[in-house]
């Protein structure tokens, strides 16, 4: 897994919530993420390593309180792990490049995939395709 900063660099470069979510499999409170209501066109990247993860065209409002997407930019962008924590059976999603925790994927999304990638804003950055502005979640 390339381009992952050292733990010290991560602690110094991320907010407390960003570090908790990406490095300790945390979850930000619902409806609080900076990128939840972002409607601009562009690409969502991993906050830790800047790998592209999701295109804005695949983002939709699932009503769950976290940014939701119906597919990643590529099969390699996401790593999937079984998560049996908190008495639930879920599929955890991590960055395929640096292994940062992103969120979970559920089989209740819209077509064409039927999947809902439920992602913490704190694990993402967004690059606006119009002006190149980057927004960190």
From Swiss-Prot:
KW ATP-binding (keyword) present: no
Transmembrane segments: none
CC cofactor: Zn(2+)
Pfam families listed in its UniProt record: SelR
Keywords, ordered alphabetically: Metal-binding, Oxidoreductase, Zinc
Reactions the enzyme catalyzes: L-methionyl-[protein] + [thioredoxin]-disulfide + H2O = L-methionyl-(R)-S-oxide-[protein] + [thioredoxin]-dithiol
Family of the protein in this entry: Belongs to the MsrB Met sulfoxide reductase family.
Protein name: Peptide methionine sulfoxide reductase MsrB
Organism of this sequence: Klebsiella pneumoniae subsp. pneumoniae (strain ATCC 700721 / MGH 78578)
Higher taxonomy: Bacteria, Pseudomonadati, Pseudomonadota, Gammaproteobacteria, Enterobacterales
